[in-house]
Amino acid sequence: LVDLADNPSRGTAMPQHRPFAILLISGSALIALAGCSASDAATSQAASTGASSAQPVVVELFQSQGCSSCPPANADLNAIAGRSDILALSFAVTYWDRLGWKDTFGSPRFTARQQDYANAGRGEVATPEFIVNGTYAVLGSNRTALGSAIARAGAGHGAPAISASGSDIRIERGAAGAPATVWLVRYDPNTRAVPIRAGENGGRTLLHRNIVRELTRLGDWSGSATTFPLAPARESGLASAVLIQRGTGGPIVAARKL
């Protein structure tokens, strides 16, 4: 577990370990975990939530290749990444980079997103950490709590419909309340095996799926039907999704895989 984020606008602090029990596994055991434990704890519970591809439960994982506690959480996310009723997103933070290994997918923007959640009272800046629907913060080693949070999140009620056509994203009318932020997320849906050559995970090969590569703020939505331009991705082979989120680090009121 690591406290405090490295962000140009917020200063830096060295990661600090806190003691807690966690199982570290690798190789075939990691793959077995992805297929069994996470399925029992998180995936099966999500099946009864009523969520769908048109309004999935959003599960964000904040992790780092430099964090020895993160591989089991990565495996849990990988296990649910293919579900149509869940939008699983893996954000690589940067505050571990100075401890021997620079994360190959890390971005200060992703670190700042986790800090925004902490500032909004949703957990603390720590790795690994899950945030479910922008509302529930879950310690990344607690698979049972992750499954419970996914089940509590359920399907969105009264959320606006989101669609994409050609080069546009359209959000239909809905009850917005306060203006909400519209985010475009581009992520890699493939499983990537990354050899780690230094740091706490040095000598291991970590499996990543649904790694976020782009996070773009499209604008605000206030309840009326709105259209935003959909620019091409900077990388080929990326999947896209839209999030509608209240405030900074607030609840996610709607989401759609495009």
Can you annotate each of these PLM segments?
Residues 15-26:
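Bacterial N-terminal signal peptides that target proteins for export
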Residues 104-123, 127, 135-258:
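Short, conserved sequence motifs used for protein processing/export or organelle targeting and
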